[in-house]
A protein has these predicted regions:
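Long, charge-rich alpha-helical interaction segments
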Residues: 157-160
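A mobile, often basic/glycine-rich helix-loop segment
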Residues: 163
Length: 185
């Protein structure tokens, strides 16, 4: 499936890391804990994550993995660092930060998530007022801010080279969409 997405220029996201198969709590309504040792998870629950190719993105699960620490993975620096190390440094997006498993104001949830090292904080539910507060809490995207601080004007050749490097890192190539793909022949 992910290979098919990748061939059409769409990036898939593996979710929910470190897995939800051992929890009985729905993280929309409460915080779940996984007490299984990491070496056991590596030989069982994480095998599918390692076997699947075609993506460089992972979404966190709002669970505590007690082997790493006592914080939800999404807001845990130790957990985010462990995911990056174990799964070859993926881009990491949080699950929705309005879920009950993550506590605090929406501002605190966004700040704690980004401070833990998550690349993108997801806000997919809630009111417009909460959404606006989440955006303000996030501020300028960190990579954009860091890039802007050291930005030098680039030629179009240099920009094209940077885009090609990004495409190579992400494992995609520019695709031309067929606008008639969904029409009967």
């Amino acid at each position: 499936f992910l290979d098919g997405l990748s061939r059409t220029g769409v990036m898939g996201i593996l979710k929910h890391v470190p897995g939800m198969g051992r929890v009985t709590t729905d993280t929309h309504y409460g915080l779940a804990t996984i007490d299984t040792p990491v070496d056991v998870l590596g030989q069982t629950d994480w095998v599918p994550f390692g076997a699947i190719s075609g993506t460089h993105w992972m979404m966190t699960a709002h669970v505590v993995l007690s082997a790493w620490d006592d914080q939800p993975v999404t807001t845990s620096t130790a957990s985010i660092n462990a995911i990056r190390e174990h799964f070859n440094d993926p881009m990491i997006i949080s699950d929705c930060l309005t879920m009950v498993a993550i506590e605090g104001s929406i501002e605190a949830r966004v700040e704690n998530t980004l401070n833990a090292g998550v690349d993108l904080a997801l806000f997919s539910n809630g009111s417009n007022e909460e959404r606006n507060r989440a955006v303000l809490a996030a501020g300028e995207p960190r990579m954009v801010r860091e890039s802007l601080e050291s930005l030098q004007p680039l030629s179009s050749e240099a920009r094209a080279h940077q885009i090609a490097k990004l495409q190579a890192r992400m494992g995609t190539q520019t695709k031309t969409a067929d606008p008639t793909w969904d029409r009967p022949s």
